From Swiss-Prot:
Gene3D superfamilies: 2.40.50.100. It comes from Nitrosomonas europaea (strain ATCC 19718 / CIP 103999 / KCTC 2705 / NBRC 14298). This is Glycine cleavage system H protein. Its cofactor is (R)-lipoate. Residues 23-104 form the Lipoyl-binding domain. The lineage of its organism: Bacteria, Pseudomonadati, Pseudomonadota, Betaproteobacteria, Nitrosomonadales. Keywords: Lipoyl. The glycine cleavage system is composed of four proteins: P, T, L and H.
Length: 129
């Protein structure tokens, strides 16, 4: 299973990419999309919405289940990927390219609380047993 080393991760299976401008891009991990199966619906937060860390802010729905997506960091939504709303299957095709939304973090220090690739792999290994 792919766990890209350059990303950060949450225990609820979101990935976070730190951008050069200080913003973060958020999506769901390969593990999450494999558990959910074929995506059929995505609901994203509104641009401009202020989110608290771990607040449920989006929904992905598959043929198997609906799953809440949580904000990995507190901050303001500065962009959403409307392409995944119209074509949810893009998440299944490449979950690391098919991002969901971008945040301007309110507290950059919250990034330090996220898992690195090694920590996320350990989480996956523990869930498998």
């Amino acid at each position: 299973m792919s766990v890209p080393a350059e990303l950060k991760y949450t225990e609820s299976h979101e990935w976070v990419r730190l951008e050069a401008d200080g913003s973060v891009t958020v999506g769901i991990t390969q593990h999450a999309q494999e558990l959910l199966g074929d995506m059929v619906f995505v609901q994203l937060p509104d641009v401009g919405r202020a989110l608290a860390q771990r607040e449920d802010c989006a929904v992905v729905e598959s043929v198997k289940a609906a799953s809440d997506i949580y904000a990995p960091l507190g901050g303001e939504v500065i962009a959403v990927n409307s392409e995944v709303e119209t074509s949810p299957e893009k998440i299944n095709e490449d979950c690391y390219a098919a991002w969901l939304f971008k945040l301007k973090p309110a507290n950059a220090g919250e990034v330090d609380g996220l898992l690195d690739a090694g920590g996320y792999q350990k989480l996956l290994d523990s869930e498998a047993h």
